[in-house]
Amino acid sequence: NIDSATSSSYAIPSDQTLVDKYLRIQVISTDSIDGMTTKLSTSQQVTNVEDEATDAVIITGAVEEGATVTADVSGIADVDDDDGILVFTYQWQSSSDNSSFSNIDSAISSTYAIPSDQTLVDKYLRVQVISTDSRGGTTTKLSASHQVANVEDEAVGNVTITGTVEEGATVTADVSGITDVDDDDGILVFTYQWQSSSDNSSFSNID
């Protein structure tokens, strides 16, 4: 007998306590001369109703170019899961406006290596996780989005001196070969300081 279940209706618990068990009702009728008859209904198995997994997925690690971030699903649980083991699938997504997100090709593992170039700098990154419980029920979770920070990249190339290096001549610092991937508009700003040395080792600024 189910404790206190003695009325004509019964509210099946919304947790998993009776899922997959069998339920029946015993009814005893009493007539006007106190004759009693006991009847049992046909038993029926209590079916599961899909419960959404709870809690959230969190992105851990520095969200910056060149870094590797991880989808932390340790807090996600599902009462439908009999063995306590959820299966997760992952899809990393990016957005330019933090509103419309697109899947990143082949980014389907629990970790994601943010490119070390500028392709995702200032864009927004999130991960979509789908959990599947032992009964086949699925829940989709989205992490909070994070803006990808820039990491300072050194300018590449060399400065060269052009012109004849002789007394009375004018020489020029040629910086045309210097580039920097951090520079969005392609225009670098340069400052200059000419220096001289007597031994080609110790140099001093020229006033």
Each model region followed by its residue ranges:
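Ser/Thr/Pro/Gly-rich low-complexity disordered regions
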Residues: 1-207
